[in-house]
């Protein structure tokens, strides 16, 4: 977008309204990659990166408290940090490249991290093939989409792709999610931000069963890959919960609780893919 505005020659490349109109989050000059790259060999590069993260959060409230700001720590080798920046800077990105390139790179690394983590990686990442199958089945073309255990946001990203592939308007899709793990919640926020997707993930990470952040939500579509067979979900503290319309879930297994939670939040004519 920046390069396109420069080519127009009207001087609007630093007008943040031009970016916000297309749901592109604004990055101040001192937080842009060109600034970081130009200072890669400076001994204060860690502080420059931390300052850049602070600026981005300040200009984009949806990312407040999400970005890591610990690059100035003494234990981080600033020479190697600079070398990493130089290495990344060798990647050639051109103006007419794929719109979703950064998002695809982010998704690739999420998949790699999940692979390394093994079974534990499933807590924040569902394979793209599985997500695509679920989305293609329930067809979230427009309406409210909800994932009560959203992980890194794969269901939302694939829903956006579905809308685009069917010539729909992404603004007709409202995204709601909740995530218990603090780090994973941040991963999801960043994943959606770099794709320009607005979402209501609640003001913080939290337990879906014990602190439902979307109590009144009735979703048109629910997409989820819940962590099955959780035994210590605290069910004995929720025996009178309004969500258990079809019986109290067993205290030693959360599977039935997940199903009832989703049924409770589903609109009368809604669809769910689990």
Mark where each language-model region is.
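Non-catalytic, mostly N-terminal accessory regions of nucleic-acid modification and defense proteins
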Residues: 1-141, 200-213
